[in-house]
A protein has these predicted regions:
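Intrinsically disordered, low-complexity Ser/Thr/Pro-rich tracts
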Residues: 1-60
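Glycan-processing catalytic domains of CAZymes
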Residues: 58-301
Length: 301
């Protein structure tokens, strides 16, 4: 399309008007000792002064999120032995009140709340709240304990939520749900991989909703799938049973693996001379315990 000379002339005039500085009235004379606000030249272009504010720090996480290299003690007996110089104590929920958790906090320690999320225990104060239909086969080797039908989240939810509320009310920082690999055991129910995945994910979300960190207990085959939902892992016998490396995905994600080896499977000397170097190579935080989880603890040299 041809452009006429009239159009070009109008366009040039528009540009001139657009870039002509606005006329500014000169300021009043400054008083004695007072600097002028700005020069009086009306053709001077003044740019605003832009200041930057510091980027605010991100908010702290809503729950404890540890990293590898966190030392720990695991004691499910009472009374608690507070003498170990460690970062974390993993202790029983029902048998310890808020004063024990407060004492750990006073020493600058994190308190983990142990509870069973996959089995029924006949000695617990809430044992009568479990409907008969969710109770499965006896848990072999643990008298008074039965597996739970984890498919029935509708029936288990009120009980498990109440337990998590107890953890929170007592001041715990985290929760260790035990027996959350039921689908790999003879429970009396046809539990599947997906059943366990759904239950464990539900548990993690419930813990986080209460500001509680949560650890994946054993359940190595689901470690990759559950990694986004769990903040750390805890293993038993993974060295002697040769499955520790499955939990390495947690280390890769900068989440610790708390590893326990037991005195009924390996000697203390073997633990320190054989298991510890390998645990260090994996960056696991390993301890040597009696299986009844009393106060005895041996760390790596």
């Amino acid at each position: 399309m041809k452009t006429t000379s009239l159009t070009l002339t109008f366009f040039a005039l528009s540009l001139c008007l657009a870039f002509t500085p606005a006329q500014v009235s000169p300021p009043s004379p400054a008083g004695p000792g007072t600097a002028e606000a700005h020069p009086t030249d009306p053709t001077t272009l003044y740019l605003p002064i832009v200041t930057r504010t510091a980027t605010p720090s991100p908010p702290p996480p809503a729950w404890w999120q540890p990293s590898p290299g966190t030392s720990w003690q695991w004691q499910l007996s009472t009374p608690i032995d507070f003498s170990f110089d460690v970062d974390v104590y993993d202790i029983e929920m029902f048998d310890n009140d808020a004063s024990v958790v407060a004492a750990l906090h006073a020493q600058g320690r994190i308190a983990i709340c142990y509870l069973s999320a996959g089995s029924w225990e006949d000695w617990r104060p809430d044992a009568d709240q479990f409907p008969a239909e969710v109770l499965g086969k006896d848990y072999e080797g643990w008298p008074g304990e039965k597996w739970l039908d984890i498919r029935r989240i509708d029936l288990l939810a009120p009980i498990m939520r109440a337990r998590l509320e107890q953890c929170k009310a007592k001041g715990f920082d985290a929760v260790e749900p035990d027996n959350i690999d039921a689908y790999t055991n003879d429970t009396g129910f046809p539990l599947t991989y997906q059943d366990q995945l759904a239950y464990n994910t539900w548990l993690a979300n419930e813990a986080h909703a209460r500001g509680l960190s949560i650890g994946l207990k054993n359940d190595a085959d689901q470690a990759q799938d559950l990694l986004p939902y769990f903040d750390w892992a805890l293993t038993e016998d993974c060295y002697v049973q040769d499955w520790c490396e499955q939990m390495g995905v947690f280390i890769t994600a900068d989440k610790p693996v708390f590893a326990a080896e037991y005195s009924d499977e390996i000697s203390a000397a073997q633990f320190q001379s054989e298991a510890c170097p390998q645990m260090a190579a994996w960056e696991f935080d390993a301890i040597f315990k009696n299986r009844d989880l009393d106060e005895y603890r041996l760390g790596c040299p």
